[in-house]
C-alpha cells in the first residue's frame, strides 16, 4: 500500500506506521474494516564494528555497545511486536534492517557481510517463536502460550 512520509492517507492495503521508539498501543496501527495493520519499519538499533563499515560518518537511530545488548534488544523488540500481533491485530512488521548500508549501521550483519552483529541463535529462536504464534492465531479455536526459553 501507499504510505506518505507523515501520516496515513487512508488508501492502500495497509494501515502503516514507521516506529523507531517503543512498540505499544499508542504508536502501533490497528487494522480497520478494509486494511491490515503493519509496522512498516522498526528497530534502527546500531552497532559499530570497526573495519567493516562504509568509510564515512555512520549513524543509527540508537547505537548499542556490544553484540549481546544488540541481540537482547532485538529479542525485546520482537516480543513487543508479537504482543501487538496478538492483542492489536498487526499483520506485518519490518525490521530495519537486514544489513548495514552506506551511512547506516542498523543491520544484522556488517556492510561487507563479514561479521554477524547479533547472536543468530537468539534471532532465529524469537523469529521462529513469532511464526509459531502467527500459525496458532490462524488456527480456529486455539489458545496461545507465550512462555519460551531462549538460547544463551
Residue ranges and their predicted role:
Residues 19-22, 43:
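Short, acidic/turn-prone active-site loops that include or flank metal/cofactor-
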Residues 1-14:
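Active-site neighborhood of glycoside hydrolase catalytic domains
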Residues 8, 22-29:
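Acidic-and-aromatic substrate-binding clefts and catalytic sites of carbohydrate-active enzymes
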Residues 26-152:
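Substrate-binding clefts and catalytic carboxylate motifs of secreted carbohydrate-active enzymes
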